Amino acid sequence: MHTAPSDTEPVSRTAPPSGSASRAGRALAQIAAALVVTLLLLVVVRLPWAGDLGMHAATIQRLRHSLLHPGNPLVDADTPSPYYSPWMLLLGVVAKSTSLSVFVVLRLAALAGLGLLVTGVWRYVRTLSAHRAAPAPALLSLLLLWGPLLFNWSGFLGLNSLALTVAYPSVFAFGLAFHFWAWLTRAVRGRTAWGVWLGLGALWALILLCHQFTGVVASLGGLAMVLAARPAREALLRLGAGLLLGLLVLWLWPYYDFFALFSAGADLEAIHRPLYQDLAGRFGLVLLGVAALGFRWHRDHRDPLVLFFCLGALVFAAGGLSGHYSWGRALPAALVPAQLAAALEVVSAGRGAVRRVWACVLPAALAVGAWTQAGTLGYVVERGALPGVVAEKYRTPWVGYQWMVRAGVRYGDVVMARTFPARQIPAYGAYTVAPGYPDVFLRDAGRREAAVERYFADGTGAQERRAILREYGVRWVVGGDPAPWLREVTVGPGGQTLYRVLP
């Protein structure tokens, strides 16, 4: 007869501490985890920009000017946007009520997201192991156990990736996901009040609204935990009520149609295809976790991490086989359980010899992962102060376009710019003619992109260029050739010329 564990009983058994070497190893892991978290806190101060940070800054810009009708974050158009999530709405309220710059608000968001992530990992790991030392190696595995090739992508928790995305909604959502899994794991193990299940449903919807791809990962993890626990019928009924409430929240969210996103995947496949490339180089160290999952499966065929991994791997593989490459964003649903399993195997019950071998192999793998991501130090230490071999791994962040604001570009001005500048300019309040990122709700995105291409094309005549500028109400142009209707205002980094459009 199977007896469900109590609310505080971990899923897996743990080994008792054994000697000074074991204590030293635990202390070393805790110190290393503390140092990594400290490094990330210092990164928040610098807040390096090399990705989608401008998209989120632009979202806060629109919300601080109009909480009810913010419009498109990137272009001057009245469209909904999936970036207007409850979390970004709260940040918009903070920006509007305090007059803080959007980049200060993003630093506050980074602190909140990092805090949620660290505490969420601790809480969830405690549902898997009662060993006091378990959370520290688990956090290190999530950040360092990746591969010999550097990989940065929103929604993936590698150290260097997290340093560049710590202010993103994906980190906030991932932190909520770990808390969601911890809360759900305890709920399915015993008698839980209706209010708890309804709260879980609302939290599930919040994660999906804040970052849809991380919401998929959270959903797969939640499903794995329910399947592993085999809850009683009463618990399933309450779970169903929570799901219905979550769906209701998704349906009622006024800033965008959540369910319309299911038909928008075709526009995202090309940019997600790289997720299926260089898998061994990017994620090779995770194979250690796959081996650990094998041990866990041998001990318990319904182990939640094993089920979680299988669901994530299934969705990822289905995306690659069917050409739905955006499904690759579900890969963390396979990576996270494998990384956690690798860490937990060090403290799991079992033969002492196996555990001791694992305690040697895991630190070695973490050291390889740390070396791959050593360039993260460059985000808090000047490159010249780094050892040469570390400095070579550092990737210089983007400069930004603050210089345009100093030159006179104001909130709401429309700027003609190519794709790369268009990914940053809206962060300062201006619009661009075409969005720098795919926008599933902007119906004329293709037409706008074609207009930008025509404007900067060598064979386009003066009359057509002027017509494009008039059509989109352009007041500024970045780059391109001088013209009689343009007045050069300043030259920014990299020789980028800013022109004012003359009447």
Residues covered by each model-derived region:
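Active-site lumenal/periplasmic loops and adjacent helix-entry segments of GT-C-fold
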Residues: 23-31, 35-167, 171-175, 212
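Extracytoplasmic
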Residues: 376-503
